Amino acid sequence: MNEDRNVEFEATDRKSNVEPENSEVSFLYLSEENMVDAGVLNAARCVDVMEEALGLMEDGDFIMGGPYNDAHGLMLYFPKKSPIENFPVNNSRDRRFIAMPAYLGGRFHVAGEKWYGSNGNNRAKGLPRSILMVMLNDVETGKPLAYMSGNLLSSMRTGAMPGLAAKLLAVKDAKVLSLLGCGVVSKACLMSIMTVRPDIEVIKLKGSSP
């Protein structure tokens, strides 16, 4: 994130981030514009943070949902039809909600959740297929710390993974990059990979549309 506006959460000695004498419950709200100002599109920084997060996961310093603490979220499915008036039904591609809670340790020491809502019919309404929000909570008290737009954050996090893979695994003199898909996530992948392999000379794309 940029130095002018550092919204990263840092824990000190893994203590609560809420002052005990402060009974107010307030939190930071970040719109998509705020997220851009905070540096969410800084692909190199995203790769570095993902490398740090994966190191914490390797150490077991994390918890995800589910009985084995590794579930990729809890999904809300809709039926194909319902006798109940106005009941939501699965009448489009990828209509679902997903709650994705987790705890991450280290200097972050924070709990959070990504709330994912998706409906293939959104395109006709001028909306993205999926709309995401992210909340961070104080892990000791449950107090909300931040509520933020999650679309750019999620795509950049996803793109940072192949960026990190290229950093650690790709041959040092790689000159050609091939991407399957030309959507938002592929753009984020391209941004991240180019930050760690700036000497790439040829980029090949394959999309589903002519």
Where in the sequence are the language-model features?
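Short internal alpha-helix immediately C-terminal to a glycine-rich phosphate-binding loop
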Residues: 157-178, 184-196
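NAD(P)-binding Rossmann-fold cofactor-contacting core
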Residues: 196-210
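N-terminal ligand-binding/catalytic initiation module
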Residues: 2-155, 161-163, 173
